[in-house]
Amino acid sequence: MVYSYTEKKRIRKDFGKRPQVLDIPYLLSIQLDSFTKFIEQDPEGQYGLEAAFRSVFPIQSYNGNSKLEYVSYNLREPEFDVKECQIRGVTYSAPLRVKLRLVVYDKDAPANTVKDIKEQEVYMGEIPLMTDNGTFVINGTERVIVSQLHRSPGVFFDSDKGKTHSSGKVLYNARVIPYRGSWLDFEFDPKDNLFVRIDRRRKLPATIILRALNKTTEEILDLFFDKVVFEVKDQTLMMELIPERLRGETATFDIEANGKVYVEAGRRITARHIRQLTKDDITHIEVPVDYIVGKVASHDYVNEDTGEIIIAANQEFSLEDLANLSQAGYKKIEVLFTNDLDHGAYISDTLRADSTVDRLSALVEIYRMMRPGEPPTKEAAEALFESLFFSEERYDLSTVGRMKFNSSIGRDNDEGAGVLDETDIIEVMRKLIDIRNGIGEVDDIDHLGNRRIRSVGEMAENQFRVGLVRVERAVRERLSLGDLDAIMPQDLINAKPISAAVKEFFGSSQLSQFMDQNNPLSEVTHKRRISALGPGGLTRERAGFEVRDVHATHYGRLCPIETPEGPNIGLINSLSAFAQCNEYGFLETPYRRVVDGQVTDQVDYLSAIEEGTFVIAQANAVLTEEGTFADELIIARQKGESGLHPREHIQYMDVATNQVVSVAASLIPFLEHDDANRALMGANMQRQAVPTLKADKPLVGTGIERNVAVDSGVTAVAKRGGVVQSVDASRIVIKVNEDELVPGEAGIDIYNLTKYTRSNQNTCINQRPTVLPGEPVTRGDVLADGPSTDLGELALGQNMRIAFMPWNGYNFEDSILVSERVVQEDRFTTIHIQELSCVARDTKLGSEEITADIPNVGEAALSKLDESGIVYIGAEVKGGDILVGKVTPKGETQLTPEEKLLRAIFGEKASDVKDSSLRVPNSVSGTIIDVQVFTRDGVEKDKRALEIEQMQLKEAKKDITEEFQILEGGLLARVRTLLVAAGVSEVKLDAMDRKQWLEITLDDEAQQNQLEQLAEQYDELKAEFDKKFETKRRKITQGDDLAPGVLKIVKVYLAVKRRIQPGDKMAGRHGNKGVISKINPVEDMPYDEKGQPVDIVLNPLGVPSRMNIGQILEVHMGLAAKGVGDKINQMLKEQQELHKFRNFLQKVYDLGETRQEVDIAALSDDEVRTLIKNLRGGLPIATPIFDGAPEASIKELLKLVDLPESGQLKLFDGRTGDAFERPVTVGYMYMLKLNHLVDDKMHARSTGSYSLVTQQPLGGKAQFGGQRFGEMEVWALEAYGAAYTLQEMLTVKSDDVNGRTKMYKNIVDGDHRMEPGMPESFNVLLKEIRSLGINIELEDEE
């Protein structure tokens, strides 16, 4: 393996054995690819905006005199970049301009003579853009559009599994689902008639649809039935025999031919009889005359002389009819072939139930069903039926739908229109009848071949089309009404409906969600989430058990582990690590192809449909050196079932062991030893981990930590290789390698880092450089760590030394005992940033003012404000402190005579304003880290706003100047090299001003050209930077676009440092969660023989019943990993030579039979020193899931670092110094602090707000509510007979309004009595009864 310079700084020991065939693909590609497809120009017009425009345009006017055509579109540059949008609270979007062509025809001239053509670019609203990390900034907050898993368009055959009818009879149905348009359902009823429903309305006999398609009874019967021919010969009735049709029937008469009896009457006809009949080549047999009675005529039989119908199609024969037929001279009679086994007479029966006789009556019947109450006319009925399934504007199966439809009804091709035609409808009915006849299977709707993914791009396109269709109507009208000579395309288009539709989708759709930004993993998982809910999807209430369950086709596509607990379980899923979407929106997963038992490195992506019948081996199948299977029988999957298969039959093999699960689940080491329920909790809780002050890489990881950290976008990653030129806390400058340069550029990359900004969850986002000046970097190296990353690896928590033992009941019921040392070392200290904003509005009584001059407020309260009334940066504030002083005008009040007198004497002007300042919420204290003032255009900026503006300008100028100097330096260095090469002396150059170098003339023409080129570049660079600064200056100084009626907004950012404390929730990665019960002095904690105390004591009883044994293995492995670090520290202490370190490290990295090859000898001395420095805290270990370190390796590593192989140490009680009875499991576990902090939850109320109707106290911390004394709590008081307590609870402590005010007065007076009155809910009940029209009144006792 080749490690880059930064990867060599800390090499993670990998215990994986299987070779890595395929790297994990870019984790956010599902979002980015989909959106790119949406906004990129698509010449075919299949996808995205292009498809939407082409589907709506051209728009013809009603009279046909003009039309509006679409030419092309382009997206301009967005006005603000992502960061500016977040600060200003606006949407990151680009204006969409569309080139339209208005064609006007000359109505007097012959048809299609063009009179006038006008082209123009028209503004069509703003399209929100996706940031590089797959999010959208909507109104200043980052949002994610979650992909939706919905039922694919196409046709589905299903059954009710015998649940509808009491008899338990299975009723089959077929449903044609288009991408947009009306649903078409066919279904059987218990009497085996076939019915049709349109859009789930009332059912009609299915043959009505066929009649509406202009089919006669005869044609309908012809489509669905085979015929049986009878011949009348000399008073006997001969039947044409197809032996196969008789199988399973009971003979009602002797079947004989040529004097030989084949089957006697009353016997069942078997396959043996049929073989004999076929062998003897019997084609006709004689049947009794009454055999034809009850059979059904296949077409009309007419008496040719009189013209009367003897028997109509679909009518049953009687003996009389037979006589009439032979009289009319019919020698051959055709009847329908039906039987009870596999040729049911369903359509024939349905036709009898169908009251319609021709096309018109059928159309009228459909019209009545769709539009009840409207009088049907022939034209209306025809137009409605036509628009239901045959009009491209109203109905579209989409390419996916057509593909699924054709494959479902057995066509080989994918071609076909987006609308249905008559053969489509007939084929669906045929297949449904076949299924009812026992031929073919019903579909499994939970199969991933029948459910597809709708991602951002597709949903945005649909919304955009909705907006366009609204515009289309308006355009049509304007085209018909307006004066076409004067009108331009932009007069026709109103962009409002389009931007409204798009805005509504991004702002308030159920699938547009506030991004979960707790840590990098939660961001990545949120973007990879697949939801079955949302518009056009399921609802929680309706979703049954089957939809939520894990299906065999989820393998490698959707994670079977990561899903929420609670009502959404199974409806919200996560994409598996290697899964991706194909062009139709179905999920695919990669497999290695196996050819003749040889496993190749060729990787094929298969969707659930394609995977169908392949035999697929698992990733951990044992292979030989040559890449063939070692065992005779291999565990493999086929059609969703696992079993043993001979090795010659294997066709594919999994690519990786973590292919099955999602990213979050593959971060859990030793997942294979955990119970599924706990693994689910572990995967979900990692997403809730709060980034700690100092990130600490997990000692025991799984090897994909780096992928998550890099792909999440929280780190700064090198775009190109080079050498680090300079580094400070907020900027990294890299001189790019010569071979990666684009001709004609300065060759300097500048990375600006994000400092202390607030995330969506109020955690802190901050980037810290990890590289030093002079270090080489390659493309893709991590230059700066973000939140929860450590040297480019995901680091959600801290490695804690833990012991599994009870400790005085402090770890009862999953509680956690923590050492004080953890608090002192700030191991779990987190920073939370809150944004508090103060808005000054224009009110009816005058405008509010932000000022330090606040009535009735003492000096002390104003001490932290500046003269503009805004708190200064760096102030430490606590609950109740004023952050922004604001006064609101209040209406003139009537003064009492006394007040008037005082005013007259002291001449004091009435203070007609009230204090409405922004204060710190009660439970919060912290430091002010930033203040931003937004002022409306045209309102004068206050002093503070101007100060902030000056500061921003200064910063911007400094940034831009520095950037310019860096780039200028790079360019001038190239000039110097050129000049020196041309023979100019260096001394002379150093004496000159550097800019004069560009004016030197050289003799060599080629060199002179080069120099002139560089000079040109220099001028361009300067001009570009001047322009850049001007743009920046304009943005900073211009007024802000605030909501109507708002004059000024002041945003104050408050940083709160939260140490860990009792009541905080912590968890491991294996679903082992608990709450801190006590923080114990370090001297009381158990310690080992070396005197090392443990940090955390966990309850051993939390392990066996929960079956998450992975945590025990993690603890042992963690102990060994830390042991390596201790050993290195010991060697450093003894000041051993470098070669001994090399030998020790080589021994460590060579341990176990793994795929990883680390050659310490190949590292330089400096690299080894850096590695040693980074391994002092312990050796990071990767144990990939399902391919992790075996027990033997853990023991081997423990032995190498001189620790007991049992992983158990002798511990001593910190309080007494006595040893505990038996050895205790001690080791290192990766613990997370979850975002469920006691500070956010702790809350108490004495009196507060009450609900308006019931007058009961509100609930919840946000409303300063009380605790609910519910039904069960009432039972408890009843059970104890505590009558007075109960009375108090139900009256004065709840909704007895008079009682509670009196009670409060009494308490204030020191009189502790209560007088219960009438609870308000009783009055509410009275009102409700009266509202039902029953007069109910209270009678007083007196």
From Swiss-Prot:
PROSITE patterns, sorted: RNA_POL_BETA
| Superkingdom in the source lineage | Bacteria
Q: Of which family is this protein a member?
A: Belongs to the RNA polymerase beta chain family.
- State which residue ranges cross the membrane: none
The Enzyme Commission number assigned here is: 2.7.7.6
Transcription: present as a keyword of the record? Answer: yes
Mind telling me which Gene3D superfamilies this protein's record contains?
A: 2.40.50.100, 2.40.50.150, 3.90.1100.10, 6.10.140.1670, DNA-directed RNA polymerase, beta subunit, external 1 domain (2.30.150.10), DNA-directed RNA polymerase, subunit 2, domain 6 (2.40.270.10), RNA polymerase alpha subunit dimerisation domain (3.90.1800.10), RNA polymerase Rpb2, domain 2 (3.90.1110.10)
Functionally, this protein is described as follows: DNA-dependent RNA polymerase catalyzes the transcription of DNA into RNA using the four ribonucleoside triphosphates as substrates.
A GO biological process this protein is involved in?
DNA-templated transcription
Q: What class of enzyme is it?
A: transferase
Q: Which reaction does it catalyse?
A: RNA(n) + a ribonucleoside 5'-triphosphate = RNA(n+1) + diphosphate
What is the name listed in the Swiss-Prot or TrEMBL entry for this protein?
DNA-directed RNA polymerase subunit beta
A Gene Ontology molecular-function term?
A: DNA binding
Q: Which GO terms describe its cellular component?
A: DNA-directed RNA polymerase complex
